[in-house]
Amino acid sequence: MKRIDFENGTVTNNILSAALPMLVAQILNLLSNSVDRIYIARIHDIGTTALGAVGLCFPIIMIITAFSNLFGSGGAPIFSINRGKGDSRTADMIMNTAFTMLCGSAAVLMLIGFLFARPLLTLFGASDDALVYAYPYLMIYLLGTLPSMIATGMNPFINAQGYAIIGMLSVTVGAVANIILDPIFIFVLDMGIKGAAIATVISQILSALLVFYFLHGKSELKVRWIHINEISECTRHARDIISLGSAGFIMQLTNSLVSICCNNVLSMTGGDIYISVMTIISSVRQMVETPIHAINEGTSPVLSYNYGARRPDRVKKAGVVLIIMVLIYTGIMWSVILIAPEFLIGIFSSDKLLLKDAVPALKLYFAAFIFMDLQYIGQTVFKSLNKKKQAIFFSLLRKVFIVVPLTYFLPYGLHMGTDGVFMAEPVSNVIGGSLCFITMLVTILPELNKMGNSR
């Protein structure tokens, strides 16, 4: 089974070897999610309303993803750093501490979701019409909480061991299954939006089974339940995992918060049609960002492993490659968004009324998108090098202290209406992205230079 050697070979090849399988997997996963929404949007008579209803479920789905990232993104870099140091025992304990916390959190989240689904959806801006479709979709989706979290949260530990192809396959299995099952459950079995949720849950179960099969039976370091006599040691590791993972967790959680705020303001200023517009914009953003996340996640284990091995030259090279690849890709996609927004929106809906409102909203939302790259690059470096404070601070800064206040101030304070909601994003990209990137340069480079001089 081919494995990436993060300490040897060219840095660019290491990153590409890790990033390309992730890119394939994430594109398939994106295609799966997009197909889900495309089919839902084309359900006869209720498509646009049903699409908006799914968008109302996004905050809860984001919260589940946030907890997956708390343990996956928090544990995998520390896992890689310890592998770089040659400390396999600590790496093993970190992975299994993350697994135990992940499973416990999944049970709690599923229970809370079942108990409070209806009031939460109402809080998120669901009208009575939208609630008819959002509630059953969410109740079925919640059944897949544990497999969803295992598939998402434990996959980074596969990639961190250098098995990028296996990581890709675990995502691919679920994505392909969802693409096949969606039309069967939605149209052939005439289950509508409930069918879309059932197809999603089945696909998540398949992905989780493959992840668990590999980590439990085939990988060098195997996933297992922690023993009673390991609890005290695992408590210390749990604090480290949660501390580092809080950055990604906060980013996902604040995405959910922003989604709630946007839906509430859009519901008041534009009605249900603008919630559907935001759902499409979120889908386009997910599509555009997929390769960026693949590059970031492909670079992360290279950064972490070589930082643990005290190879600052390779850490610097990985950072430069990350910056170049992300900025070139985003420059191309940014141009496509501004030149041909109708094409991107048309992928998700053919509703002419929706298209009329969505085109200017999309252009406004992505007006300064390239600055968002600076945030992603900085966050990836901070997380990979176990810089907890910086990672957490910049996760909070952009979303909580810039986007959320602007989402209310621009529409109501400056009377910009729905445009104000979409304008909040580019303003936050410029401010938050620039500050994060500059801070990374002035704090990380001196440390790496010092590490190099001490070798």
Q: What are the roles of these predicted feature ranges?
A:
Residues 22, 26, 38, 77, ...:
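Transmembrane alpha-helix boundary and packing residues in multipass membrane permease domains
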Residues 6-38, 42-46, 59-74, 78, ...:
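N-terminal transmembrane alpha-helices
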Residues 1-19, 79-144, 188-245, 303-368, ...:
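Short alpha-helical transmembrane segments in multi-pass integral membrane proteins
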Residues 51-111, 148-167, 263, 275-335, ...:
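Small-residue-rich hydrophobic transmembrane alpha-helices
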Residues 69-72, 141-159, 167-178, 196-211, ...:
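Short runs within selected transmembrane alpha-helices of multi-pass transporters and secretion channels
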Residues 17-36, 140, 174, 203-207, ...:
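Transmembrane helical elements of multi-pass membrane transporters/channels
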Residues 27, 31-52, 121-128, 184-191, ...:
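Helix-terminus/linker motif at the lipid-water interface of multi-pass membrane proteins
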Residues 48-59, 134, 138, 197, ...:
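Small-residue hotspots at the loop-to-helix junctions and early N-terminal turns
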